[in-house]
Amino acid sequence: MSVFSKEYCEKMRVRIDCGNMLAEAVGKHGITAEEISEMLPRAEGAFAGVEKKRGEMRWRLLPETQLEILPAVEEAAEFVRSKADTFVILGIGGSALGPIAVHRALNHLYHNDLPSEKRKSPRLFVEDNVDPERKAALLDVIDTDRTVFNVITKSGSTSETMAQLLIITRMLIDRYGEEGLRDHLIATTDKQKGNLIGIAKKYNLRTFIIPDGVGGRFSELCPVGLVAAAVGGADVRALLAGAGYMDELCSNADVKKNPGLMLALLEIIAAEKHGANIGVLMPYADSLKFMADWYAQLWAESLGKKLVKDGKVLRFGQTPVKSLGVTDQHSQVQLYTDGPFDKTITFISVGKYRSDVAVPHVFDDIPGIAFLSGHSLGELISAEFRATEHAVTVSGHMNKNIIMPEVNEFTLGQLIMLFEMQTAFAGELLGIDAFDQPGVEEGKNATYALLGKPGYEAKLDELKNAEEAKKKLIV
């Protein structure tokens, strides 16, 4: 239940405008009223399925369950802020994309470049790749005396994350001794599974537990995301409150009043009836740029599944594409207006930006640019959104708009929960498990084999044979 007033919740409510998904707006490539009516029984079943599994979907309970750990989160954040000038996250997938997205959304867009007295919180680096040049570059720009690392892996065995941990731990022990690790290293992991929890206990590290039943791509509202957000100065209670408010909205059985179910329903109809196997997410705000990265993992990893039914292999999934308004008007929108009808475009518009910049009168004698003077960049970006929405619509391409009154912790919490609920409903509509990722395991096992992990000898032989076959077509 939201701690904010009813009036505030209504004022800051994230809304969806789906009118441009319909045939009456975009023509023959849009969704018809009949298609929606035909899908309503499936939508009702999807809603019932999600509600029945509510207790199993532990991520959905986070707005309530994580309140009890907030004192520990805030204490750790205060420690980091007092100790460090730099906060580094070692993680990959949801352990990285969520913290990046929230940090970008809620902090100064050039946060790391600000002088420390203006930043008021440590610089944030999220190391989500094992490119050796990148790791070497990070070590060139940080002062370990004033750096705290947070290693995040639920399994405690993620190769990319644990390799980075080995590098950082060796460096820290060499400089500060084993007793100094606690001042520079935080662990976020499972309460008992995997290798990291044992390391954390051995060295008495500050440790945060990822709750049972919360997968990486659904983990932003637990310590995976909350610690980094608190270090950055975010009001994490408002973030959770916003998510809880959206969960309430998505608990309505009426599809026309349930934003998550409506989004899922329209995307599935678009995919099944109109061949829209691509979904573009295009926020018109630099602050939301990396929400598209986080959403891409959520949507792709949850719905990209293979099932065998009646002897037939069925494949599901819609390919997410990241875009940014207005930047990608000059790189992608040509495709979205004149290209094939194989995609939906989801815009995110912002009612009020936190800053605005006036366009001054300078070249009033040049009519081709003088018309811009007297306006502001806020007016310009809003006009460009409306213009692009119009262009995509009149070209006959399905699109919709997620409307954020402004970008703050409460509205961002709503957006996170909205996308998570949309994904859960979509999984039920398709009849698939949206919470596993079996397709990822093959690559993990191959990596283990190539690096000599015991027990993967047969996989190594398989890889060698594949290499021989591949040589036949190398130019």
Where are the language model's segments positioned?
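Helicase-primase coupling helices
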Residues: Q318-V407
